[in-house]
UniProtKB/Swiss-Prot annotation:
One of its GO terms (molecular function) is DNA-binding transcription factor activity. Pfam families: WRKY. This is WRKY transcription factor 72A. The keyword DNA-binding applies. Its main location: nucleus. It is found in: Nucleus. One of its GO terms (cellular component) is nucleus. Gene3D superfamilies: WRKY domain (2.20.25.80). Residues 170-185 have a biased composition (Low complexity). Transcription activator involved in the transcriptional regulation of terpene biosynthesis in glandular trichomes. Binds to the promoter of the linalool synthase TPS5 and promotes TPS5 gene transactivation. In association with WRKY72B, contributes to basal defense against root-knot nematodes (RKNs) and potato aphids, as well as Mi-1-mediated gene-for-gene resistance to these pests. Both WRKY72A and WRKY72B are not required for gene-for-gene resistance mediated by Pto, another tomato R gene. One of its GO terms (biological process) is defense response.
Length: 526
């Protein structure tokens, strides 16, 4: 209808331009409509694309989450399996640990029982102290000389010997394996070459000292344990050595435990000591030494080592000279001092005076014991220089001693004058060394000044006679025995407990030997 109107207007001569405008507007409207349609279609397509993209993204996001959940579940399953494996492994480890712990307790219990058994066994075995300063060559040479001399002395009825200390033994024969250095001291000579040549005095002295140091090695079946009783407030006595405590044990009847120490001066030193309080007097400390040092001793430890070694040597000299078995009917009496030897003034004194002290020994067929009691207070007595005696070559002095099997020997050493008292103080070793050395040197010098010094040739001849003539040695030993017997004749002797001898006067014997340098005179005093 609109077209018809336009056609009429055109036919009637209407304005043609208006029709054209209308047509143009209509065409523009149509184009706009088309544009709108296209744009709408585009929007719809775009929306569809957006929807598809968003759906795809949602799908991708959901897939990712699902994958993550699945991977997390897989990881959790793996962790759970690993936990199960770890639990099984931990159970196995705990089981092995319990088994090992049980085995450890069993081993520790066995070691404790073994240690207790060893301690009990060590208490029965008695070991003597030695210096451990001799070489193997000297020991071999010394053993050969002792064996050869023993074979020659078997022909004699009585085997009497002479050394720096006074000793003699019975005629009971013993096997060469039981030889002791005391069996041939002072009689060493070269019998293998068949000559009468004797050793020089200084070599004889060195041999005697080496023999005294090797008592345990030459006679392993005769061993001694040395106990020292001293008043001490500290847990242990300061004897100069280094010790490490390796155990303790409660003894029956004594509330104080017995501590066990080992010498740590050298890594392989076998020396041990036991420390315990006395049950009767808690202020008294009992220290028992056993073993042999296999290393050089420090200067602060030499005094105690030498003193205990001398006490053990004194006991061993008596036990080795008696019968070989417990059924022996006779036993020889043995008396020896603490071997006050001074070979050189520059060296420290090897042994010390023990004032207010007593030595008690319990003799056994295999395990003799000896105790140094430094706590007794004996009555004082003088020690005059004129008590040095000259012993003549005579056998007019009959021996005085008991032939009983002694199980206990007690030697109470009397003290010296009050102005010469030397109290034992193990905490201050240097002062004791100085006072003891000065005191003994003064006594030796005063004794030597009262005698007329013989020429060196005469002294050498006398020394040669003493070391080579057994009869002279026998006579001299008998004279020494008679003098010692007269000293102990005023004291009580118990037949059951053994020989109890108290020496109220020291018995010094002055032996002078020529030195290598002229004018140098050395005195060796017992």
């Amino acid at each position: 209808m609109h077209m018809e109107t336009v056609f009429r207007k055109s036919t009637h001569g209407g304005v043609v331009k208006q029709d054209i405008k209308i047509k143009a507007s209509e065409e523009g409207f149509v184009e706009d409509i088309n544009d709108l349609k296209v744009e709408k279609e585009r929007k719809s397509i775009h929306n569809e694309d957006d929807n598809s993209k968003s759906s795809q993204q949602k799908d991708l996001t959901g897939d990712k989450k699902d994958d993550q959940l699945e991977s997390a579940k897989a990881d959790m399953e793996e962790v759970m399996e690993e936990n199960q494996r770890l639990k099984k492994h931990l159970d196995k480890i705990m089981k092995d640990y319990r088994n090992l712990q049980m085995q450890f307790h069993e081993v520790a219990q066995r070691d404790a029982e073994k240690t207790n058994t060893d301690v009990k066994h060590d208490e029965a075995e008695l070991v003597s102290l030695s210096l451990g300063r001799t070489s193997s060559d000297t020991k071999k040479e010394l053993s050969k000389l002792i064996l050869s001399k023993k074979e020659n002395d078997e022909k004699e009825e009585d085997n009497l010997t002479l050394a720096l200390d006074c000793k003699f033994q019975s005629s009971t024969k013993s096997s060469p394996s039981n030889l002791s250095p005391e069996n041939s001291l002072g009689e060493v000579k070269d019998d293998e070459k068949g000559t009468d040549q004797t050793w020089p005095p200084h070599k004889v002295l060195k041999t005697i000292r080496n023999e005294e140091d090797d008592v345990t090695q030459q006679n392993p079946t005769k061993r001694a344990k040395v106990s020292v009783r001293v008043r001490c407030d500290t847990p242990t006595m300061n004897d100069g050595c280094q010790w490490r405590k390796y155990g303790q044990k409660i003894a029956k009847g004594n509330p104080c435990p017995r501590a066990y120490y080992r010498c740590t001066v050298a890594p392989n030193c076998p020396v041990r000591k036991q420390v315990q309080r006395c049950i009767q007097d808690m202020s008294i400390l009992i220290t028992t030494y056993e073993g042999t040092h296999n290393h050089p001793l420090p200067h602060s430890a030499t005094s105690m080592a030498f003193t205990t070694s001398a006490a053990a040597s004194m006991l061993l000299s008596g036990s080795s000279s008696s019968g070989s078995g417990p059924t022996s009917s006779t036993a020889s009496a043995t008396t020896s001092a603490l071997n006050y030897c001074f070979s050189d003034n520059s060296k420290p004194n090897p042994f010390y005076n023990l004032p207010h002290s007593s030595i008690s020994s319990s003799s056994h067929s295999q395990y003799p014991t000896i105790t140094l009691d430094l706590t007794s207070n004996s009555s004082t007595s003088s020690f005059p220089g004129q008590n040095y005696r000259t012993i003549a070559n005579s056998n007019n002095y009959p021996p005085r001693y008991n032939n009983n099997n002694s199980s206990t020997n007690i030697l109470n050493f009397s003290s010296f004058e009050s102005n010469h008292l030397l109290p034992m103080s193990w905490s201050n070793r240097n002062n004791q060394d100085t006072h003891s050395q000065s005191y003994l040197q003064n006594n030796i010098k005063s004794a030597a000044s009262t005698q007329t010094l013989l020429p060196q040739d005469t002294i050498a001849a006398a020394t040669k006679a003493i070391t080579s003539d057994p009869k002279f040695q026998s006579a001299l030993a008998v004279a020494l025995t008679s003098i010692i017997g007269s000293r102990s004749g005023n004291h009580h002797i118990d037949e059951k407990s053994g020989q109890n001898m108290k020496v109220t006067e020291p018995f010094p014997v002055l032996c002078s030997f020529p030195s290598t340098s002229p004018g140098d005179h050395k005195d060796y005093t017992l």
